[in-house]
Amino acid sequence: MSSTTTSPGTDTEPGTDTRWRALLVLCAGMLMMVLDATVVNVALPAIQSDLGFSQSGLAWVVNAYLVSFGGLLLIAGRLGDLLGSRRVFLAGLLLFTVSSIACGLAQDQTALVAARFVQGVGGAMTTAVTLGMIVTMFPEPREQAKAMGVFGFVASSGGSVGLLAGGVLTQLLSWHWIFIVNAPIGVVVHALTRRWVPATAGIGWHRGADVLGAVLVTSALMLGVWTIVSPAAELGWGAVRTQVAGLVSLVLL
């Protein structure tokens, strides 16, 4: 996403250039999102035992996050263009952190699934603008390639780290801690983002907002993701319910 930025620094040495610090902060934020996608899988048996989920209900601990995350990525990226990428990143990170605490404190099925849905919203807002911010901070091709390499390594390795972290936290503490641990990390990343990541200026809500289009596209994407994770997975693609949901999703697009 293209945005106007303040100068992130002039020193070209990675050790002293503020841009490289900003890159590490953005990668840390992205790592939180990647970890969350895998850390929950390890804790599902403990969550099911503690909260009494049925097998089909347990799937929504994962699916609630996927539906909101996948459905809102596009509109979150557009919000970055309108309001400024850093502003959307910070708002998404705050929402993700608060909802992580809500997940960790959840005492029933409804509270956990609802908090997971909100977590997906925050994850979408943070993820959608991260790559564009990195590209904007590193316009020179050689530096941009290095920055993208660091970002790609963090994103690809986060899944393995999440599986390990999920197992350790669940075994040594409880499943609640796979969510609560996001709180201190989120606070630190939020503070460092405000300090090191350059502020961005969006084009303005009044110049580029298409409310009806945003509602239709977001509804279509969320319905499409829901179709994949629910009726298609449970009933198959040949089921009437799956086909109707998929058709409505296409019509909304």
For each predicted feature, which ranges?
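Transmembrane-helix bundle of Major Facilitator Superfamily
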Residues: 2-195
